[in-house]
């Protein structure tokens, strides 16, 4: 990916604007970081959800079933986003830089998924911790409280990490997208120059025709 990005930076802007596949491979470190977070979310939420669902009993069946289902659905959401980005990149069906920047690894869609995951984990953890204060047998209360604190802590870490990530990447414009936009603006300037030159040439032809008519 880094080799493609370096090659892309050496291309002219008008040629670079047509190389859509290079837009997906820019900023490989950011893409690797977001992909690693997605893998951790899928593995952690999936394993936690399966563990809660498999340990469901009559005494603590309701909350384990609910939290396990939420964690499995959350892992499925993150996995579907990654698969969708890979499928769109392989099919090469998007030709706009804004859409590529949204769907690629490290783009806006990843930030939305991480934000939703952190919010769901935080709310679920706080809900479990609040329910653990209600009168109930000791063992389910202890398990519910520990799971709630763990989920709330993970959600807080995700939200804090996303905030630091957004602060760190704010103000940085993707170089390939910038060059693509400049290339498009360059094409627009050239077309305006051509139109002006065409108008000038037509005016010159009109003056030439009038001068010939006056001579005759």
Swiss-Prot record:
Keywords: Membrane, Transmembrane, Transmembrane helix. It comes from the Eukaryota. InterPro entries: TMEM125. Pfam families: TMEM125. One of its GO terms (cellular component) is membrane. It is found in: Membrane. Its main location: membrane. The chain crosses the membrane at residues 32-52, 65-85, 111-131, 144-164. The keyword Mitochondrion does not apply. It is a multi-pass membrane protein. The keyword tRNA processing does not apply. This is Transmembrane protein 125. It comes from Mus musculus.
């Amino acid at each position: 990916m880094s080799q493609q990005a370096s090659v892309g930076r050496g291309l002219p802007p008008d040629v670079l604007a047509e190389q859509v596949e290079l837009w997906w491979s820019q900023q490989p470190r950011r893409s690797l970081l977001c992909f690693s977070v997605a893998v951790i979310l899928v593995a952690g939420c999936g394993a936690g959800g399966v563990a809660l669902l498999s340990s469901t009993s009559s005494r603590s069946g309701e909350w384990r079933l609910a939290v396990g289902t939420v964690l499995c659905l959350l892992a499925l959401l993150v996995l579907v986003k990654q698969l969708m980005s890979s499928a769109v990149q392989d099919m090469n069906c998007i030709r706009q830089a804004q859409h590529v920047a949204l769907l690629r690894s490290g783009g806006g869609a990843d930030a939305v998924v991480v934000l939703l995951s952190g919010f769901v984990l935080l709310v679920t953890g706080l809900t479990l911790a609040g329910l653990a204060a209600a009168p109930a047998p000791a063992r389910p209360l202890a398990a519910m409280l520990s799971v709630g604190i763990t989920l709330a802590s993970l959600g807080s870490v995700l939200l804090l990490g996303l905030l630091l990530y957004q602060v760190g990447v704010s103000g940085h414009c993707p170089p390939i997208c910038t060059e693509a936009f400049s290339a498009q603006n360059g094409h627009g300037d050239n077309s305006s120059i051509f139109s002006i030159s065409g108008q000038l040439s037509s005016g010159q032809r009109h003056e030439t025709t009038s001068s010939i008519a006056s001579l005759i």
